[in-house]
């Protein structure tokens, strides 16, 4: 009992650290092999523990994967909200949107989040529905910024903002699949490019007589 109290005073308990290790291992295995190919046995082997010991921390492989996905959305949300806060309350909604998109991109590249999203569709419906609720709450941050910009007359009319949001976030999420950290563009460059497309468009307008 004294050891347990001491561990809690010092921060994470041994169980907390084991759980965190299992999450990190599963995250890496999903990225390398996809969720279909991993098993509790392969997770245990990578974590250097017995498969049966996992049940002290998680009830199933699906529960571990759900936790990995939740940690991903939670981490992205934290990064995005921090970027918005850093932009300042007096900044325009478009500047805050740029900051949010940049933070989203940085996080998805760092965490290779696209590989985890493929696992969502394979979760049991109950776990999938829970994860999608988190995704909707996260997406609402970006939806709110677009709506604020629209109310302030900063956006052209005639666009479906839900589609704009989904296209923008979806495009940035999948950058990790092709991004080369040694290439000519940084994540900031890519986020700036997207904002240029959103704000000015790609196709030249014909000159009016």
Label for each model-derived stretch:
Residues 1-17, 206-209:
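N-terminal intrinsically disordered/low-complexity leader segments
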Residues 70-77:
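Short, basic, alpha-helical segments at the C-terminal edge of helix-turn-helix-like DNA-binding modules
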Residues 105-143:
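Short secondary-structure transition hinges
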């Amino acid at each position: 009992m004294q050891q347990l109290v001491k561990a809690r005073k010092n921060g994470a308990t041994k169980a907390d650290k084991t759980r965190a290790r299992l999450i990190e291992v599963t995250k890496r295995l999903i990225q390398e092999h996809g969720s279909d190919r991993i098993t509790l046995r392969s997770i245990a082997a990578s974590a250097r523990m017995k498969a049966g010991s996992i049940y002290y921390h998680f009830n199933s492989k699906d529960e571990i994967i759900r936790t990995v996905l939740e940690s991903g959305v939670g981490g992205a949300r934290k990064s995005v909200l921090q970027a918005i806060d850093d932009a300042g309350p007096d900044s325009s909604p478009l500047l805050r949107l740029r900051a949010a998109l940049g933070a989203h991109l940085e996080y998805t590249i760092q965490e290779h989040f696209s590989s985890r999203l493929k696992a969502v569709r394979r979760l049991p419906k109950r776990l999938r529905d829970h994860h999608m609720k988190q995704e909707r709450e996260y997406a609402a941050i970006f939806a709110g910024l677009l709506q604020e910009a629209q109310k302030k007359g900063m956006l052209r009319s005639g666009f479906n903002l839900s589609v704009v949001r989904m296209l923008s976030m979806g495009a940035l999420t999948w950058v990790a699949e092709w991004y080369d950290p040694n290439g000519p563009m940084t994540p900031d460059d890519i986020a700036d490019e997207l904002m240029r497309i959103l704000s000015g468009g790609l196709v030249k307008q014909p000159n009016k007589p």
